[in-house]
């Protein structure tokens, strides 16, 4: 799992240990962001059920102004924090440990 494009391109993202999740593949992520690319730069992003934070981090890497990450799971919340720091986007991120539903 990595950041596909932007300022954090190539940054490896840590998975949530012990969780049987299937992260969004790089190909799917790239296709999604190709569709919305005209709306990302300067945007305020909300990454609900953030998991690893990869979608919000990708948006920040591609020029989003800010991202609020929402994750209830304690282990995943910790991984989002680590991944945000590793991608060097901490100044544009707020991470909330709460239910999104």
Label every model-predicted segment.
Residues 1-101:
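Class I S-adenosyl-L-methionine-dependent methyltransferase catalytic core
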